[in-house]
From Swiss-Prot:
Pfam families: Ribosomal_S16 (PF00886). NCBIfam families: S16. Signal peptide: none annotated. GO terms for molecular function: structural constituent of ribosome. The lineage of its organism: Bacteria, Bacillati, Bacillota, Clostridia, Eubacteriales. It comes from the Bacteria. This is Small ribosomal subunit protein bS16. Belongs to the bacterial ribosomal protein bS16 family. Disulfide bonds: none annotated. The gene is rpsP. One of its GO terms (cellular component) is cytoplasm. InterPro entries: Ribosomal_bS16, Ribosomal_bS16_CS, Ribosomal_bS16_dom_sf.
């Protein structure tokens, strides 16, 4: 099972917000997921990004791969190098 840490799109048309989830890479983007570990709202100023750093470290240690977008958000927060 290839596990990814990725964004799940929520909200309305032209007004998205995202949940940061751990999901099998074979599942649809907005489909089933294993665990929700945070939220990301790019619309508000300043941008809101809340995430449970301990859960991120646990999942990465267990082999989960963050997507490029999530990886850049985690680097900005200083959670990963």
């Amino acid at each position: 099972m290839a596990v990814k840490i990725r964004l799940k799109r929520m909200g309305a048309k032209k007004n998205p917000f995202y949940r940061v989830v751990v999901a099998d890479s074979r599942y649809p983007r907005d489909g089933r997921f294993i665990e929700e570990i945070g939220t990301y709202n790019p619309i508000v100023e300043p941008v809101q990004f809340k995430i449970d750093a301990e859960k991120v470290q646990k999942w990465i240690k267990n082999g989960a791969q963050p997507t490029d977008t999530v990886k850049s958000l985690l680097k900005k927060q200083g959670i990963i190098e």
